[in-house]
From Swiss-Prot:
It is found in: Membrane. InterPro entries: C-type_lectin-like, C-type_lectin-like/link_sf, C-type_lectin_domain, CTDL_fold. SMART domains: CLECT. Interacts with NF2 and RDX. Interacts with TLN1. This is Layilin. The C-terminal domain interacts with the N-terminal domain of RDX. It comes from Cricetulus griseus (Chinese hamster).
Length: 374
C-alpha cells in the first residue's frame, strides 16, 4: 500500500502527538509511525556536528541494525511527507542520504543513465525527483536529497529537497524507513519452551555511544600497557645514572692522582737553587762538622782506599780498565787518585795526581767529580 494524502495527515497527527523538545520540533532519530504503531515508519537522522555524519554504506548499515532500510521514496506524496519531517527538524545545511543507488553494471548504448538507479530495499518504484541537470552519471553513484537552506536558487530553481547523485564516501545525514508490516511485540518461544524477548533496535545515537565507550576502553588499555612497560624500567634507568656518576667520579680521582704535584717536581730537580747552594744547613755540612780531627787523621784498618785510575795515553780508548778500579793504594806516580782516607771514608780533596801524559788535557777530560763514599 502506497502512502497517500490520508497517510500524510495521519503521520502529521502522530508527529504532533510524539514527545518533543522545548522548542516544539521533531527530534532527530525520533520514530514516526502511522497511528503511533503501524508501519511504514520513518526516522530522520540529523547531526548538527558535520564530523559525526556518515557515508552511504555507514548510513545503510545503521538503518539495517535498527530494523529498517535507507528510505525509498515511492510517490510524490511520500516525498512531500519527508520534506515536512525535515522542515519540522529546523535543521541547518546538510544533505540526506536516501536508498537510491546506481547499479554497478556497464551502461548499454540504448540505456539512459537514470534507468540504472535502483532502491536498496528492493522497491520497484520508478518515482524520481532529480534536479534539472542530475544525475551526472560520473563517479557519483549514490543519491542524496538536497537540504541547503542557505544556498541561492540555481538554474533549475531551488535546490531544496531535490535529488542529486553524490560520491558514496561523502558524509551526510540520512533517513531510515521501516517495513510496512506491523512490528511484533509477542515474545518468541524456543524449542525448549523458553520465551525470548524481541530484539531491541539499536539507535544511531546508542551505536555512537557504544563506539565511544569502546574507543575509550581501548585507549585506557593502551595507556595501562605503556605504564606496565615504563614503570619497571625506572629502577634500571636510575641504576644506570648512578653507575655512570660513580664511574665519572672514579675517573676524575684517578686522573688527579696521576698528575704530578708541582711542589714535588721542584724538589726533584738536579741542581739546587742558588739559595740552597749557600745554605749552611745542608746535610753534608752537618756531617762534616760532626767529624773530629782524629777521624780525619787516624787510619781505620777495616776500610779500603777507594781509588780512581786515570787512563794513560797508551791505553786504547775502549779499555775498560780506564774507568775505575777498587784497588789498594799505589804510589801517586801510577796514576791513581786517592779519594777516601782509611780512617773516615770521606773525600779529603787533597790529592789529585794525573799521569804525566795527560797533564796537558786535564782541564778538559781529566777532571774527576768529587763524590762522597761513606
Amino acid at each position: 500500500m502506497q502512502p497517500g494524502p490520508a497517510l500524510q495527515a495521519v503521520l502529521l497527527a502522530v508527529l504532533l502527538s510524539e514527545p518533543r523538545s522545548s522548542k516544539g520540533r521533531l527530534l532527530s532519530g525520533q520514530l514516526v509511525c502511522r497511528g503511533g504503531t503501524r508501519r511504514p515508519c520513518y526516522k530522520v537522522i540529523y547531526f548538527h556536528d558535520a564530523f559525526q555524519r556518515l557515508n552511504f554504506e555507514e548510513a545503510k548499515e545503521a538503518c539495517r541494525r535498527d530494523g529498517g532500510q535507507l528510505v525509498s521514496i515511492e510517490t510524490e506524496d511520500e516525498q512531500r511527507l519527508i520534506e515536512k519531517f525535515i522542515e519540522n527538524l529546523l535543521a541547518s545545511d546538510g544533505d540526506f542520504w536516501i536508498g537510491l543507488r546506481r547499479l554497478e553494471v556497464k551502461q548499454v548504448n540504448n540505456t539512459a543513465c537514470q534507468d540504472l538507479y535502483a532502491w536498496t530495499d528492493g522497491s520497484t518504484s520508478q518515482f524520481r525527483n532529480w534536479y534539472v541537470d542530475e544525475p551526472s552519471c560520473g563517479s557519483e553513484v549514490c543519491v542524496v536529497m538536497y537540504h541547503q537552506p542557505s544556498a541561492p536558487p540555481g538554474i533549475g530553481g531551488s535546490y531544496m529537497f531535490q535529488w542529486n547523485d553524490d560520491r558514496c564516501n561523502m558524509k551526510n545525514n540520512f533517513i531510515c524507513k521501516y517495513a510496512d508490516e506491523k512490528p511484533s511485540t509477542t515474545p518468541s518461544i524456543r524449542p525448549g519452551g523458553e520465551a525470548t524477548e524481541p530484539p531491541t533496535p539499536v539507535l544511531p545515537e546508542e551505536t555512537q555511544k557504544e563506539d565511544t565507550k569502546e574507543t575509550f576502553k581501548e585507549s585506557r588499555e593502551a595507556a595501562l600497557n605503556l605504564a606496565y612497560i615504563l614503570i619497571p624500567s625506572i629502577p634500571l634507568f636510575l641504576l644506570l645514572v648512578v653507575t655512570s656518576a660513580a664511574c665519572w667520579v672514579w675517573i676524575c680521582r684517578r686522573r688527579k692522582q696521576e698528575q704530578p704535584d708541582p711542589t714535588t717536581k721542584e724538589q726533584h730537580t738536579i741542581w739546587p737553587t742558588p739559595h740552597q747552594e749557600n745554605s749552611p744547613n745542608l746535610d753534608v755540612y752537618n756531617v762534616i762538622r760532626k767529624q773530629s780531627e782524629a777521624d780525619l787523621t787516624e787510619p781505620r784498618p777495616d776500610l779500603k782506599n777507594i781509588s780512581f785510575r786515570v787512563c794513560s795515553s797508551e791505553a786504547p780508548p775502549d779499555d775498560i780498565s780506564c774507568d775505575y778500579d777498587n784497588m789498594a793504594v799505589n804510589p801517586s806516580e801510577s796514576g791513581f787518585v786517592t779519594l777516601a782516607s782509611m780512617e773516615s771514608g770521606f773525600v779529603t780533596n787533597d790529592i789529585y795526581e794525573f799521569s804525566p801524559d795527560r797533564m796537558g788535557r786535564s782541564k778538559e777530560s781529566g777532571w774527576v767529580e768529587n763524590e762522597i763514599y761513606y
